[in-house]
A protein has these predicted regions:
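Inter-helical turn/loop segments and adjacent helix faces that build the functional surface
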Residues: 10, 76-82
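Active-site gating/metal-coordination segments in enzymes
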Residues: 1-72
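H/E-rich (His + Asp/Glu) clusters that bind or coordinate divalent metals
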Residues: 34, 46-70, 81-169
Length: 169
């Protein structure tokens, strides 16, 4: 497990590549856990009370996973598995738009780091990403995520002690 960014640095930097090599060598997944957003993105959330678990954690961690996918981490390491909580930090619900706009961005050549991938973002979520429902004990969301990613990609987890709802068990 790693707490998302490290002092504002993300795992898509080449500096962190040995972590991924080691994970693939020992066939172990990486769990990216939310952390407080870095200073560069927390300001507008903090002043509105949207930092932390209410919104900020998910946005920051979802962005981190998306940065890894779009840099081609799963093209470089096809067997790598990455886990995130909170129903995939909302990425499963954005898949159509993520795929569409990523492909449009690649075609436009507007962003230097946005390159073609071997698969769609949706395909990577179905083969290389595992999610837990921690903090999201809401049946419609769980069923949607299972439908989009596959039942074998969605795991149960309780966000204890931060969110404890005995009925969800």
């Amino acid at each position: 497990q790693i707490n998302s960014h490290t002092q504002g640095r993300y795992l898509d930097e080449e500096f962190f590549d040995p972590i991924f090599r080691a994970l693939v060598e020992v066939d172990q997944p990486l769990y990216i856990h939310p952390a407080t957003s870095p200073d560069s993105m927390i300001g507008p959330m903090l002043e509105a009370g949207l930092d932390g678990a209410v919104f900020g954690f998910g946005v920051e961690t979802g962005m981190h996973l998306l940065r890894l996918i779009t840099i081609g981490i799963f093209d470089k390491y096809p067997t790598l598995q990455i886990m995130v909580g909170h129903m995939g930090e909302a990425l499963p619900y954005w898949l159509y738009r993520l795929d569409y706009m990523h492909q449009a961005g690649v075609r436009s050549q507007r962003y230097e780091r946005m390159k073609p991938l071997k698969k769609t973002i949706a395909e990577y979520l179905k083969t290389n990403v595992l999610v837990t429902n921690s903090g999201v004990a809401w049946e419609p969301a769980i069923k949607f995520c299972q439908q989009v990613m596959g039942e074998d990609r969605v795991m149960y987890a309780m966000d204890y002690p931060y969110q404890y709802v005995p009925q969800e068990v």
